[in-house]
Amino acid sequence: MRVSSWFWPFTFGVRLGWLTARCPNPDPAQTRDRIFFFRGNAVVFSRGFGKMCGLLRRAGYWAEDLRCIGHRWVCRELTRRDEGPPGRVIFVGHSCGARYAIHAAEYLAPIGIAVELLVCLEVALPPPVPVNVRAAANLYITRRRLYPAGPLRPRPGCAARIDNVDLDAPGSPIRRGWLNHLNITDS
């Protein structure tokens, strides 16, 4: 269910990288990969995405920091060229933004655009991973929850390698009690 689209159906202002990344994107003709960060339900959440976007841009990657409902803009951006996007497509989403990253991948599946990597951080009730996703990683916390976060599961026919990592599980490299839903992108 795409509840955020009902609460904020206007897709203008979905690109935040001009404000949060603190440096411009490199020339698209000079880069091959496209990395899209989908924030949680409000602009103030997922603050670390702007920082990550800026680091990737300075390293020569094309990256965009987006509001969660930026999935429509992403799909238009990736389908506007006849030959499809150059290089790899990578989606990173937090919370509601992770669900929208999955929805964007789902939209791109019938037109043959692959998502090389899908990274979900703390996504609640995730839809199944679409068939066009090649690899997926899901980092989530199972304790101190207001709503359920759980593992990603493949859609029938999906051959993606899916890694689900419970950061509260025994042996986790994360110090217990320190990480939460709001600071996971700043870590």
Task: Show where each model-derived region lies.
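Intrinsic disorder/low-complexity detector
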Residues: M1-R2, A159-L167
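C-terminal partner/receptor-binding element of secreted or periplasmic proteins
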Residues: V14-T20, R144-R145, L182-S187
